[in-house]
Amino acid sequence: DALPILNAAKLAVADINAAGGLLGRSVELVDYDDALDTNQAVSIAEKLTTKDGVVAIVSGSYSGPTRVAAPIIQAAGIPMVSAYAVHPDVVNAGDYIFSQSFPGQVQGKAGAVLAVDKLGAKRISIIAVDLDYGSELAGTFEEYAKAHGAEIVSYDKVAMSDNEFTSIITKLKQDVKPDLIYMANYYAHASEVMKQCKTLGLDVPVVGTEGVDSWQFLETAGKNADGLYLTTNMDRDTKDENTQKFMKDYRATYNK
């Protein structure tokens, strides 16, 4: 999931250097993969702040690794911007830590407003990845939905490694009978959920989150993506020139 962030960072570095760099110097990009492992995240944060001599950091990792890295980066006095992490502890690490993503509480509530107030859902099933991301979004979604007349009729937590959802969707269709599914997960899970809903004939609205907002989802889901609603902070219809230029350059460079 971090690949789009790394690709975007490479584009930014290329643009900056083409314009003469920063303060007369070329920008160099150093990248590491924490593999969603908090121990690796700590090691990488320590290396970046003590050995690599970086002046700014962009995190394309999830909340768990970013939460443990943030205090180290804060203590070093180096600014960091998180692309994905939604847990409030990330930005609460200090005034050098920023996030461009929705806080989990905001996006979870937005999903519930869409599901309950706009789509009229009364019986909702939740499928959430068993990480900070899933628990933050699903928790806030559930709180708002219940307070506004909806019932959470099932709640399935899934591991990042899970890649088969036939049993869950079969249970929802035959026994639970929701009128909407809320997914607090990432594109690989969402692709399989949408596929199984279509295959098994569970024809209900599905509301996803920005973790699904990726060209990788469209590639893996194909026609099964039809009918999915998303809460996301990327407005592709905006007339903002910088955003439109970024999308044009990204597609031209990466064919995505």
Where are these regions (language model features)?
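Short, polar/charged alpha-helical segment
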Residues: 4-23, 140-146
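Second-shell loop/turn segments in exported
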Residues: 31-34, 55, 95-101, 129-131, ...
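Beta-alpha junction/loop-to-helix N-cap segments that form part of ligand/metal-binding clefts
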Residues: 4-7, 19-91, 158-162, 186-189
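Loop/turn elements at helix/coil->beta-strand transitions in domains of secreted/extracellular proteins
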Residues: 24-28, 51-56, 75-80, 93-96, ...
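Extracellular/periplasmic Venus flytrap/periplasmic-binding protein
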Residues: 43, 87-89, 96-201, 236-245
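Extracellular/periplasmic periplasmic-binding protein-like sensory domains
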Residues: 194-256
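Mature extracellular/periplasmic domains of secretome proteins
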Residues: 45-53, 72-75, 113, 170-173, ...
